[in-house]
Structure formats: structure tokens, C-alpha cells
Amino acid sequence: MSGAYPTTPVADSIKITSITPTLVSLTHSLKRQARSRGGQRWTISATYAPLSRAEFAPIWAFAQQQRGQYGIFTYQPPIYKDTSGTATGTLLVNGGDSAGDSSIACDGLTGTLKAGDFIKFASHDKVYTLTSDATTTLAIEPPLMSAV
């Protein structure tokens, strides 16, 4: 891992896209068939107001450290780094959730995590998103890439 994306300057707007390779075909009778490849990744596009050279320098230097597409890094957009819900406390996974699961039993929270919130488990590099509001059972996408 090549570090974390600079937190300053802050982007004016951010677009997050989920990329999930899917094969889709049509039969001769026009029935649609779809198959998932099982992978997923996020792409993020950030737009900045015009910056001076000094303001842009941390972003430029970080981009160069990545050596094109070689580097891997983390990025927490300020607007998305906290839940949009009322959850407080420490999320504890009850365990026994396997790769491929998309429903995760947990406890330790008071309040609610909201659909669209992002979550990362301590033992994972992968970031997941909640597909519904949650208090004790998290519905996530993509499904777990490895056990938690």
C-alpha cells in the first residue's frame, strides 16, 4: 500500500462508482441472461476548484508516488467518512461470516447505520457499502471477499 490520499485541499465534488463485471447476453428468443464475475472495485472522481501550484502540490506529489496504476492507496472523502445515521459505539462482528456472505450479524452499536454508508472491517482491505438501514444485521454489497 502506498499510503493515503491527501486530505487537503478538499475536493469540491466527488463521484463514487461501483464497478461489478457482469456478462449479459440475449438468447435467440430475446431472453436476457446475466452472470456475475464475482469481483468488485470502486472508482472515485474528484473535482477541485482552481488551485495554485502550492495548493495542488500535495495531490501531484501523491499521484507521482503511485507510479501510474501500480500503487494502492486509501481515500476517505470527508463527506463520506462518517455514518449518515445515528450510530455510536464500536461495531463488533459476531463472527462466523464467510466469503460470499452479504448479511453480517453484529452488535456493539447504539443507533442506526444508514443505507449508502461505507464500512470496512478491521481484517479487510476491502470497503463495502450498506444496502439498507441497519442496527444489528448489516446488508452489504459486494458480498464479503473473505471471512470476518
Annotate the PLM regions.
Residues M1-V148:
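Extracellular/virion structural assembly segments
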